[in-house]
Structure formats: C-alpha cells, structure tokens
Curated annotation (Swiss-Prot):
SUPFAM superfamilies: Actin-like ATPase domain (SSF53067), Heat shock protein 70kD (HSP70), C-terminal subdomain (SSF100934), Heat shock protein 70kD (HSP70), peptide-binding domain (SSF100920). The gene is hscA. InterPro entries: ATPase_NBD, Heat_shock_70_CS, HscA_NBD, HSP70_C_sf, HSP70_peptide-bd_sf, Hsp_70_fam, ISC_FeS_clus_asmbl_HscA. Belongs to the heat shock protein 70 family. Pfam families: HSP70. This is Chaperone protein HscA. The keyword Metal-binding does not apply.
Length: 616
C-alpha cells in the first residue's frame, strides 16, 4: 500500500528542495540580476558575458528590445528608445517636465496627471516600461537557473516614496514576478559587505548611481542591520556628470543646435565614453559630429566638483541625523558605477578620513545583497538570524484641534513598525471624526505635508472627551503606510492606505528637516499658543453647555460675572497673546468654581433621590 505524503500547510512537500530566488537591482542607467548558488551570491551574465543590462527599452510596432540592443537604437530612434525611466516612476507629468525639460520624448498626461510616453507601440507609462526591463532580467535568471523564480527582492533608492515603491511593485507584478520584498539599495549593499567581511559598528553607504544619490548611516551588530539615518538626492547621479560633460563638449565643438536628437545622442554617448576612460587615463580624445579634441581629467573634475560637493553636504546632514561623527564611521561602502570616478573616491575618502571600500564591484554590490536577502526570504536559509531594519525619512502624525500636528511615528523610526495612539472627541454629541494624516517635522499643519484624509463615522453620541478612538499607524517593510481608526466601545472602524500619486523630492525632504531645526523655537511658541486657543475654546464650549443646563443655580449678579469672564476669554482667544489667554482661562475657572460646586451638589442630590442612608 502506498504511503500518503503529508507536508506542513504552506510548505513544499519536498522541504529540502531548494527554491529559486533572485535579487534585482532595478537601476536608472543599468540593471542587474543576481542569485545565490553553492552558498555564494553572484550576478548573472547574458550570452555575451555581460552582467549589466542597460535600463533602456526600444519600442516598435511589432515588439520591443531591452538592454544593449535597445541602446544601439538610441541615436537613430530617440523618441522610441526610453532610458532612465526610473526617474519618472511615481512622478506627475508636470513634475517630470519641470525637472527634466530636455527629455526627447512626447508625453501625454493620464487622467490622474501621470506621464504617458508616445511610442510606436502606443502610449506607455513608466510602470509598463519598467516591467519590460524586469521581464528581461527574469528571463536571464530563469534560463541560468533552469526554472521559474519563486520570488524576487527588488532594490529601490532609500528616498523612494510610497508612490514610487508601489509603482515598482506594480511593474514586478506586471512582469509576472512574486515580490518577496522591496529593499533599500544602501541596505542591500550593507548586507553584501556585512556578510562578506563581518564588520560590526557604524558604516556609511555612499551610493552614487546613474540617476540617484543615497547616503545611509547604518549600524551592523551581530547580524542586525539598522539604518540610523538616510539622506540623498533622487535627481543627482552619474547621468548628471554625463550631461555636464556633453554640454562642455558641445561648447568646445561649437554645436549650437539642440533640436537634433541624433546629435544630442552622439554627444551624450561621447561624454559617457570619455567619463569612463578618464577613470584610468589623464586625458582622452573625443571625436563627435565632425569635431575632434582632447578632454582632461582635470577639466572633467572642474565640471563635476559642485555635484560631488552636494553629495558630501548630504553626507554631513545624514551624520547629524544619526548623531554620529565622521570619525566614528568604521567603513565607507561605495555603491554605484559613478563611484569609480577618481574625484568621487578622493573626496569621499577625505570627508570620512579613510579610504572607501571597493572590494565588491560597486555596480554589483546592491544586486548581490538583494540576492542574499531573497535567498533568506524564499526559505532557503530558515535558520538565518539576520535582521533588517530600515527607517522612515519623515515623521508621520495626525492633525489635532487648533491646526496642530501630533506625531505618531517619529522620523528615522525603524520599519516595519506599528504605533497606536488614543484620541477623543472635542464636542458634546460628536458622532464623526475627520482623520487627517500628516507628514513632516513642524508643529503646525500649515507647515507639514498632507498625505490623506478620511472620516470615522458612527461614533456614539457622548459628552466631549467621552469617546475613545484608537488610531493605528502601520508602515510595512516596503515603506507603505496604512492608518486605521477605531472607536473602542463600538468597534466602529475606518482605514486608508496612503498611496499618493506622486511624492516629495529628496531636496524637499531635506528642506523640511532643515526648516524644523531653523524654526524650532518659533514652532514651539506657535504650538503653545495654539494649545492655549484650543483650551480656551474647550472651556467656552463646556461653559456654554453648563449654563444652558443649570443657569437657574446662579443669581443675576453671579451670571453677569461669569458672562463677563467668558466674554473676555472669547476676545483674548482671538489674539496671539498666549499669556493673556492663559490668565483669562484661569479667571473663568476662578469665577465658575462656585457654579461647578453647585452643579455637583445638584447631581449628587439627584443620584440620591429615593434612596435611604442605609442603601448608600
């Protein structure tokens, strides 16, 4: 008789069968796919031995090509050859056209203002284009591993907001991939170096790719990866080096026409080739559009010096956020092909006071880290003790009475995280509450960013302060925020998942953080004033209700004194004199103490009516 084969629910009937997983570095300029084989993480090459896949897609009516074949068409068919699509992910069309006015594509806006690119294959959005790149990477992995992938980990810049992260996940699903997790690129690099060299302590991950710059300060200790702080610029990278050098070559060659897309592409290709050559040579010969000349490393350094300085300013801010001095950083990990530029390595070494780590190919280190994490998440290393902690870049909270922001999850809190806080009603008989989710570091709503609004209805009619509403903020491992509000006594609940159509830029995040420090004293005073005004409104609301119910307990003279005190409080509450408001509140309290005592006596007498002393 055959034996029944029984396995644990949700697990393979062959528990020792290795699952196929991959780590994908979906980059602005180039992308890679890596996996763990025989205990070693490695990037996978194409049939020609090339590990990098240019993040370029060329569209035609009958199909498309991805990578090197697509990039070869860039000069001849610029409008249908889409590159650096990662920069468009999660952004509005207006934002893209403002930031990147020289993109050689024809755009249309979707119904919600997101970009659609006109191609020979029709209107395509950044999610679809990214999906085509992911499909090419997945096909490479499937062929190399001789099987379909059980799951992937895809890396994203640390500063990607909710919309950009969600767009990346949507692209993966469109490509037919099961996303195990989105992983911050600097964190992936920390995984790669943490496992290879076993370093413990504080490290800096300096990630300068084609289109983005990220700096992360991390603490590695006994397998725990904790991001202390992040910073960067989602619109700064090696592409900007290329464009500066291309503009310089244009000036030297005397090319005035910017409308010829083919010449534009030739200039950019020449600039990229020159940049790469100047990493090893002191000068390089350039031949473009009939012009021939030499470019020196010194000239190139002069062009990019300001951009490199910008990255170091972000490093300084991140160190300050982490509460760490530069000399406390044990190692500096270099990530991204642009870190091969000698000036970058030199300036970074000077800033941190130590030569940066470059043992792992900076182009491959992120994909390798993602592959290691994917191998764990897919279940190939169930005994792994590695823990990964990322952080949120800006505080999350709610609007409260008076236009104040109550922070629920502070900036740089590790994720995933869930925090709950109790709130209550302001008015008697209030049956609904508006939940306004905020993001930012300032004290007032007007100085922070609105993320979402929703209403909790069906609250039991109670006196002010009687209802208890628990609001829970939950940020998952991908940085996506869910907010739930529930009234405790009835279980009435409402929730929202925050997916803004487009989010903040890194420079705006940095500005918000800087403003919170610059205006700290002013904000505290403004908050104190707002709180005084809210308290004044609460006192007046309560007094109005009390007088409506029990005015008969007062003589005409007593009522006049209380009315005068209330009128004075109502008047000063409109001013910005916090001390005067505080004194007026105290005066109302003083003038109504006897009234409050009489109301209490009345309530006690009513409660005792019909009962004997023995019963009490």
């Amino acid at each position: 008789m055959a034996l029944l084969q029984i396995s644990e629910p949700g697990l393979s009937a062959a528990p020792h069968q290795r699952r196929l997983a991959a780590g994908i570095d979906l980059g602005t300029t180039n992308s890679l796919v890596a996996t763990v084989r025989s205990g070693q993480a490695e990037t996978l090459a194409d049939h020609d031995g090339r590990h990098l896949l240019p993040s370029v897609v060329h569209y035609q009516q009958q199909g498309h090509t991805v990578g090197y074949a697509a990039r070869a068409n860039a000069a001849q068919d610029t409008a249908n050859t889409i590159s650096s699509v990662k920069r468009m992910m999660g952004r509005s069309l207006a934002d893209i056209q403002t930031r990147y006015p020289h993109l050689p594509y024809q755009f249309q806006a979707s119904e919600n203002g997101l970009p659609m690119i006109e191609t020979a294959a029709g209107l395509l959005n950044p999610v679809r284009i990214s999906a085509d790149i992911l499909k090419a990477l997945a096909a490479r992995a499937t062929e190399a591993l001789s099987g379909e992938l059980d799951g992937v980990v895809i890396t994203v810049p640390a500063y990607f907001d909710d919309a950009q992260r969600q767009g990346t996940k949507d692209a993966a699903r469109l490509a037919g991939l099961h996303v195990l997790r989105l992983l911050n690129e600097p964190t992936a690099a920390a995984i790669a170096y943490g496992l290879d060299s076993g370093k413990e302590g504080v490290i800096a991950v300096y990630d300068l790719g084609g289109g983005t710059f990220d700096i992360s300060i991390l603490r590695l200790s006994r397998g725990v990866f904790e991001v202390l702080a992040t910073g960067g610029d989602s619109a700064l990278g090696g592409d900007d080096f290329d464009h500066l050098l291309a503009d310089y070559i244009r000036e030297q060659a005397g090319i005035a026409d910017r409308s010829d897309n083919r010449v534009q592409r030739e200039l950019l290709d020449a600039a990229i080739a020159a940049k790469i050559a100047l990493s090893d040579a002191d000068s390089v010969s350039v031949n473009v559009a009939g012009w021939q000349g030499d470019i020196t490393r010194e000239q190139f350094n002069d062009l990019i010096a300001a951009l490199v300085k910008r990255t170091l300013m972000a490093c300084r801010r991140a160190l300050k956020d982490a509460g760490v001095e530069a000399q406390e950083v044990l190692e500096v990990v270099m990530v991204g092909g642009s870190t091969r530029v000698p000036l970058v390595r030199e300036r970074v070494g000077e800033f941190f006071g130590r030569p940066p780590l470059t043992a792992i190919d900076p182009d491959k280190v992120v994909a390798i880290g993602a592959a290691i994490q994917a191998d764990i998440l897919v279940g190939n290393k169930p005994d792994s003790e590695m823990l990964l902690l990322d952080v949120i870049p800006l505080s999350l909270g709610l609007e409260t009475m008076g236009g104040l922001v109550e922070k629920v999850i502070p900036r740089n809190t590790t994720i995933p995280v869930a925090r709950a806080q109790d709130f209550t009603t302001f008015k008697d008989g209030q049956t609904a509450m508006s939940i306004h989710v905020m993001q930012g570091e300032r004290e007032l709503v007007q100085d922070c960013r609105s993320l979402a609004r929703f209403a909790l209805r069906g609250l039991p009619a109670m006196p002010a302060g009687g209802a208890h509403i628990r609001v829970t903020f939950q940020v998952d491992a991908d940085g996506l925020l869910s907010v739930t509000a529930m009234e405790k006594s009835t279980g009435v609940e409402a929730s929202i998942q925050v997916k803004p159509s487009y989010g903040l830029t890194d420079s705006e995040i940095a500005t918000m953080i800087q403003d919170s420090m610059s205006f700290a004293e002013q904000d505290v005073k403004a908050r104190m004033l707002a709180e005084q005004k809210v308290e004044a409104a609460r006192v007046l609301e309560s007094l109005t209700g009390a007088l409506a119910a029990d005015a008969a307990l007062l003589s005409a003279a007593e009522r006049q004194v209380i009315d005068d005190a209330a009128a004075h409080l109502s008047e000063v509450a409109q001013s910005d004199d916090g001390d005067a408001i505080e004194q007026a509140i105290k005066n109302v309290d003083k003038q109504t103490q006897e009234f409050a005592a009489r109301r209490m006596d009345k309530s006690v007498r009513r409660a005792l009516q019909g009962h004997s002393v023995d019963e009490v």
